[in-house]
Design a protein with these regions (language model features):
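Catalytic metal- and UDP-sugar-binding loop of GT-A-like glycosyltransferases, i.e.
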Residues: 6, 114, 390, 433
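Left-handed beta-helix
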Residues: 207-413, 418-424, 439, 445-451
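A short, charged helix-loop
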Residues: 163-196
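Residue-level signal for inorganic ion chemistry
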Residues: 41, 95, 117, 161, ...
C-alpha cells in the first residue's frame, strides 16, 4: 500500500503568516506531544507513524514546497514534484504514473490519497484502515471517507456524499454505497443534503493503481510519466472530485464521526494553538480574547482589544475581528506583493528592502540564513550582480571554480554570468544586495559542483 499526501495551496486564508510559498500546512503553531510546536504536515506524518501507516509515504507537491517539506519531515519520505499547480486530477495522475513506472508498483497495489493538513485524532486513521480494507475487498472502485457534519451551516467549500444506509445497520463501521457525490454545491442544496444525512467529503480517495491508470489514459491519452511531466504546465486546472468522483458510479464511503477540523481560518487555527501571544508582544489593559503573533523585531502593544487577531510578518500586518477572519482570502486577492520570507532546502531568506530608481535600475536586499552543513547550488545569474556581505558564521565560497573560505566581515562581488556557490560550515548569515533591471527568482541556471 502506498500513501500520496497532497501538498498545495496558496496560503491566502492565513495571511500574512502564510503566503504563496509558505502555505498553511507549514506553520509550526500546533502543540506537539514532546512540548514543542509542530506544523499541520508534521502532525499528519507523526500520526501516520503512530497508527502504522508510514511504510510508503509520497508527497505530491511543488518544487518550492518540497524544500519546506525536506526541512520539516525527517525519515524515508519520497517526493513527486509537480512543475506547476494544475489541480488535484493532474497531481494524482502524475503520482500514479510515477508509482507505476519509477517505483514499479503492480496494478493491484492499493493507493490512498489524502490531504496533508487534516486536523484529526487517531480514530481518523482507524477509519482510513477500514477504507483501505473496502478497496482491497474490491467492494468499490473508489472508497471515500465521509465526515459526519458537526454543524448545520451549509458550508460550500466541501464536497457532499449522499449514501445508502449501511449494509449492516448494527455495524456503524460498515461501509455504504454512494448514491451521489456533490462537489461544492450551492448553499440551498448543501442545506438540504445535511438535512437528508449527507456526509462531508474528507478529500480521501482509496483505489487500486490499475483502475486509476486506466482513468489517466482516458483523461490524458496514451501518456507516460515523462510525457505528462513535460506538458504539465499546459494542462487545464482540473479537480479530481469534479472530473472523476462526481461521474463515478462505483463508489463506497466509510463514515467517520470523530474530530475533524479545517484549520483554514485564523479563528479555527487559534482555537487549537493554545497560544495567546508569540514573538515580541506586550499585552496592555483590558485585552480580551485577543491573539497576537509577531515575527518582526519591532514590538506590538495591544490595549483594549476584544476578540481580535493581530499577526505581523515581513509580508504585512493583519488586524481583524476573529469572527470575520474567514473572509480574509477575498481581501488578500487584491494585494500584489511578492513573498518577503521563504524557506529553502538550505535555510531561509528574508527580503529587507526592494527599491526601484528613477533610471529603472533596481536593488533587492535579502538576509540569507544558511543552515550549517547545507549549501546553495552552483549557479549563475544572467541579469543581475550580487554583493554578498558575510555578517555571521563561517563557510566555503566558490566563484568560477576558485574555492576560498569565508567568515564574518568578508565582502564578495559576484558579477552577472559568474558561477558561484556557498556552503555553511557553521550557521551562516549573508546580506545579499542584488542589482540590475530584472530581479526575478527565475534568473538562475544551475550546474554541478562537488564540495569534497
Amino acid at each position: 500500500m502506498h500513501i500520496i499526501l497532497l501538498s498545495g495551496g496558496s496560503g491566502k486564508r492565513l495571511w500574512p503568516l502564510s503566503n504563496g510559498t509558505r502555505a498553511k500546512q507549514f506553520l509550526q503553531l500546533l502543540p506537539a506531544p514532546n512540548g514543542v510546536r509542530e506544523s499541520m504536515v508534521q502532525r499528519v506524518v507523526r500520526q501516520l507513524h503512530e497508527c502504522g501507516l508510514s511504510q510508503n509515504i509520497h508527497f505530491a507537491t511543488s518544487l518550492a514546497q518540497k524544500d519546506q517539506l525536506c526541512n520539516q519531515i525527517i525519515g524515508n519520505i519520497q517526493y513527486i514534484t509537480e512543475p506547476d499547480h494544475r489541480g488535484t486530477l493532474p497531481a494524482i495522475a502524475l503520482s500514479v504514473l510515477h508509482l507505476s513506472e519509477n517505483q514499479h508498483c503492480d496494478r493491484d497495489e492499493t493507493i490512498l490519497v489524502m490531504p496533508c493538513d487534516s486536523f484529526v485524532n487517531n480514530e481518523y486513521y482507524d477509519a482510513l484502515k477500514r477504507a483501505i480494507r473496502v478497496t482491497e475487498s474490491r467492494s468499490a472502485k473508489f472508497t471515500l471517507l465521509g465526515i459526519q457534519p458537526t454543524s448545520e451551516i451549509p458550508f460550500t467549500r466541501y464536497g457532499y456524499i449522499f449514501a445508502e444506509p449501511p449494509a449492516d445497520p448494527t455495524n456503524p463501521y460498515d461501509y455504504c454505497k454512494v448514491i451521489r457525490f456533490y462537489e461544492k454545491p450551492e448553499p440551498d442544496v448543501a442545506r438540504t443534503l445535511i438535512m437528508q444525512g449527507a456526509l462531508w467529503n474528507a478529500g480521501v480517495f482509496v483505489f487500486k493503481l490499475g483502475d486509476m491508470l486506466d482513468i489517466v489514459h482516458q483523461q490524458f491519452g496514451d501518456t507516460n510519466y515523462a510525457d505528462l511531466y513535460s506538458r504539465y504546465s499546459e494542462l487545464p486546472k482540473l479537480s479530481f472530485d469534479r472530473m472523476i468522483i462526481e461521474k463515478e458510479t462505483n463508489l463506497a464511503v466509510v463514515r467517520y464521526s470523530g474530530k475533524w477540523k479545517d484549520l483554514g481560518s485564523w479563528n479555527s487555527l487559534l482555537e487549537e494553538t493554545n497560544v495567546r501571544e508569540m514573538g515580541n508582544v506586550m499585552i496592555g489593559q483590558d485585552v480580551v480574547n485577543t491573539h497576537i503573533i509577531n515575527e518582526l523585531d519591532q514590538p506590538i502593544l495591544c490595549v483594549g482589544t476584544h476578540n481580535m487577531v493581530v499577526a505581523a510578518t515581513s509580508d504585512g500586518i493583519l488586524v481583524s475581528r476573529k469572527d470575520i477572519s474567514g473572509t480574509l482570502k477575498h481581501n488578500v486577492d487584491n494585494l500584489e506583493v511578492r513573498p518577503m520570507f521563504e524557506e529553502r532546502r538550505w535555510g531561509s531568506y528574508k527580503v529587507i528592502s526592494n527599491l526601484t530608481f528613477a533610471d529603472g535600475a533596481r536593488a533587492l536586499t535579502k538576509l540569507l540564513c544558511i543552515t550549517a552543513g547545507k549549501s546553495i547550488s552552483y549557479q549563475i545569474h544572467h541579469h543581475r550582480e550580487e554583493l554578498w556581505t558575510f555578517v555571521d558564521g563561517e563557510g566555503e565560497l566558490v566563484v568560477d571554480d576558485v574555492l576560498r573560505k569565508v567568515k564574518r566581515g568578508d565582502v564578495v562581488l559576484i558579477k552577472a554570468g559568474q558561477l558561484h556557490a556557498v556552503r555553511a560550515t557553521t550557521d551562516l548569515k549573508i546580506i545579499e544586495v542584488q542589482s540590475g533591471t530584472k530581479l526575478i527568482e527565475e534568473d538562475i541556471e544551475r550546474f554541478e559542483w562537488t564540495w569534497e
